[in-house]
């Protein structure tokens, strides 16, 4: 089952957890790959179920964990307490904005 659908891409809860874990591990080590994770400022005004500061990290359609190069369109968003805020995508959004994944 899809825990999040970004455009036509289905992400399972385990894929989301793996991306969040990889992003949070880098965040907590004060490290990054290709400038991810970085602070997500929520200019779009999403009503996330957890409070921020938020960080974004790519979640890849291939199922691999992001290790650099092209981040693709989709992101997991988590806070500094390693709580998942949501999954967002550039797919279907204008310019460099994000929309929520279903």
Curated annotation (Swiss-Prot):
Keyword Lyase applies? yes
Asked if Transmembrane is a keyword of the record, the answer is no
- Residues that span the membrane, as ranges: none
The UniProt keyword set, sorted, is: Disulfide bond, Endonuclease, Hydrolase, Lyase, Nuclease
Q: Cross-referenced InterPro entries, in alphabetical order? A: N1-like, Ribonuclease/ribotoxin, Ribonuclease_N1/T1
Enzyme class label: lyase
Disulfide linkages recorded for this protein, renumbered to the chain, are 2-10, 6-101
Tell me its EC number(s), please. 4.6.1.24
Active-site feature positions: 38, 56, 90
Q: Which GO terms describe its molecular function?
A: lyase activity; ribonuclease T1 activity; RNA binding; RNA endonuclease activity
Q: What does the record give as the reaction this protein catalyses?
A: [RNA] containing guanosine + H2O = an [RNA fragment]-3'-guanosine-3'-phosphate + a 5'-hydroxy-ribonucleotide-3'-[RNA fragment]
Extract the Pfam families matched here: Ribonuclease (PF00545)
Please report which protein family the annotation says this sequence is part of.
Belongs to the ribonuclease N1/T1 family.
Q: Quote the PANTHER family the UniProt record gives.
A: EXTRACELLULAR GUANYL-SPECIFIC RIBONUCLEASE RNTA (AFU_ORTHOLOGUE AFUA_4G03230) (PTHR42104:SF1)
Protein name in the entry = Guanyl-specific ribonuclease Pc
Lineage here is: Eukaryota, Fungi, Dikarya, Ascomycota, Pezizomycotina
